[in-house]
C-alpha cells in the first residue's frame, strides 16, 4: 500500500471509530422531500407503557401529556383533510424501531413527534424543535414559530439532532419539545386541558400551513383548528 494512502487511512480512522461509537454517522436513509406535497401526517406520542419519559411532580408523567396533545393534533389535522396515522393511541410501549417502521410505512408523508422536556435545573423552560434532514428544517421552524405565539413562551430554538426517529426517517420528520415538566410553571400548564389544546392548535396549524400555505387553509380547517377542548385522555 502506498505510504500516502496509508497515511490518509490512519488520519481517517479516529473519525470513523468515533462515528461508530456514538451512532452519529451520516444519514442512514435518503430522505424524500415531501415537505410541500404530503397528504399523510404520522403523529408520534413520545414514550408510553413502561416508559414514562420524564416524570415530575409539577407536570406528571410525560407519556400522558404527549398522548393527550398528540390526540388533539391528530383530530385537528383530520379536520383539515389530511390523513393521520398515530404511532400509539393508548398507553402502550412502542419501541423506537417500531416507531420508525410506522413512519416509514407511509408514503408521501411527514412525521411529527410530540415530547415534553426535563432538566435538573427547575428554572430552565421554553420550547424547542428538532430535525435531522435539511428538507425537514422548514417544518421545524414553522412549528417553533407557531409555538412562540403562546403567551409567555420562551424560544429555545430549532436544532439539528440525531434522534433515531429523525435520523432513520424516509420523509421529513421533526420532534417537538413542548416545554419542561421540571419547571413549576410549564409543568403545571402541561396538566391543563386548555393549555394542551393551545399546543395542539399551534402544531396542527403549522403542519396545515406547511402543506397548503396560510392563504389556502380551508374554511373547515379554520373553524376546527381552535375548536373542541374535550380532553382526549382522562389524566385523573
Regions found by a protein language model. Give the residues of each.
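Catalytic-site microenvironment of enzymes
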Residues: 1-236
Amino acid at each position: 500500500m502506498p505510504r500516502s494512502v496509508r497515511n490518509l487511512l490512519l488520519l481517517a480512522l479516529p473519525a470513523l471509530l468515533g462515528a461508530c461509537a456514538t451512532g452519529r454517522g451520516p444519514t442512514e436513509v435518503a430522505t424524500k422531500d415531501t415537505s410541500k406535497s404530503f397528504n399523510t401526517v404520522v403523529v408520534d406520542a413520545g414514550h408510553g407503557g413502561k416508559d414514562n419519559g420524564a416524570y415530575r411532580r409539577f407536570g406528571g408523567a410525560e407519556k400522558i401529556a404527549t398522548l393527550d396533545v398528540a390526540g388533539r393534533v391528530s383530530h385537528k389535522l383530520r379536520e383539515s383533510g389530511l390523513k393521520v396515522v398515530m404511532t400509539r393511541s393508548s398507553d402502550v410501549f412502542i419501541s423506537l424501531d417500531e416507531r420508525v417502521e410506522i413512519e416509514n410505512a407511509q408514503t408521501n408523508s411527514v412525521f411529527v413527534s410530540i415530547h415534553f422536556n426535563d432538566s435538573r435545573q427547575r428554572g430552565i423552560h421554553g420550547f424547542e424543535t428538532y430535525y435531522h434532514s435539511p428538507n425537514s428544517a422548514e417544518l421545524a421552524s414553522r412549528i417553533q414559530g407557531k409555538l412562540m405565539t403562546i403567551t409567555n413562551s420562551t424560544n429555545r430554538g430549532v436544532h439539528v439532532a440525531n434522534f433515531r426517529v429523525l435520523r432513520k426517517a424516509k420523509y421529513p420528520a421533526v420532534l417537538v419539545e413542548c416545554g419542561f415538566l421540571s419547571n413549576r410553571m410549564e409543568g403545571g400548564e402541561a396538566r391543563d386541558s386548555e393549555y394542551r389544546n393551545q399546543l395542539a392548535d399551534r402544531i396542527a396549524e403549522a403542519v396545515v400551513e406547511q402543506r397548503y400555505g396560510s392563504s389556502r387553509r380551508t374554511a373547515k380547517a379554520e373553524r376546527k383548528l381552535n375548536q373542541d377542548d374535550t380532553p382526549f385522555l382522562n389524566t385523573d
